[in-house]
Regions:
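Small cysteine-rich, disulfide-bonded extracellular modules of the LU/uPAR three-finger superfamily
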Residues: 1-144, 150-192
């Protein structure tokens, strides 16, 4: 009896372990704006995904990581006018932002003061305003966007150039016309 058996077996296995787990923190912010007329009816709503300026990032890092006591001045929120508009840039500062002007006293639309931000506790990598900030228009015009200023010298006075510009941005849906007595209800969420 001649029996032959040829047994063949092939088996493969591989294990790949990803050792370069990287988390990247980038500063982002989003303004949500609702415009209401004098009777409280919604006229329009839009969002702004903003530019966090280089100086704003630097102040945030110095504040977060300095290891000493620090009391924040501000932040205060203001509005960007369509007057003399060209662009928002990461290199903008409160003293030098040639691509845009602040709405308020000199440039339409007009309102009385920048608004003071009050925050909820941070959660899931984000920090949001605890309530919408309300801007009541005292004169008609076209609003382009919003900005945040804080740090040493920052104040609620419209057109003041002190403090550090943290962020600025324009509406995703284009310019927005507002009338005298309209209100802009603005929320903001910052995330890393």
């Amino acid at each position: 009896m001649n029996e032959k058996a040829n047994a063949k077996c092939a088996c493969g296995c591989s294990l790949v372990k990803h050792t370069d787990l990287i988390k990247k923190a980038e500063a982002h912010g989003r303004f949500n704006v609702v415009c209401k007329d004098k009777d409280g009816k919604i006229k329009w709503q839009d969002t702004i995904d903003n530019v966090v300026t280089t100086l704003g990032k630097n102040l945030a890092l110095d504040t977060f990581l300095a290891g000493s006591g620090y009391t924040v001045t501000g932040p205060y929120m203001g509005l960007i006018s369509s007057v003399s508009w060209s662009a928002v840039a990461a290199a903008d500062t409160m003293g030098s932002h040639a691509g845009w002007t602040e709405a308020g006293i000199t440039n339409a639309p007009t309102y009385t003061t920048r608004k003071t931000c009050a925050w909820d506790a941070a959660a899931t990598g984000a920090k949001a305003l605890s309530a919408a900030l309300v801007f009541t228009m005292t004169g008609a015009g076209t609003v382009k966007g919003c900005f945040l200023v804080y740090g040493t010298g920052a104040v609620t006075t419209v057109d003041n150039t002190d403090g550090t510009l943290y962020s600025a941005g324009v509406f995703t849906g284009g310019d927005k016309v507002v009338a005298d007595t309209d209100t802009l209800n603005v929320t903001y969420t910052a995330s890393l």
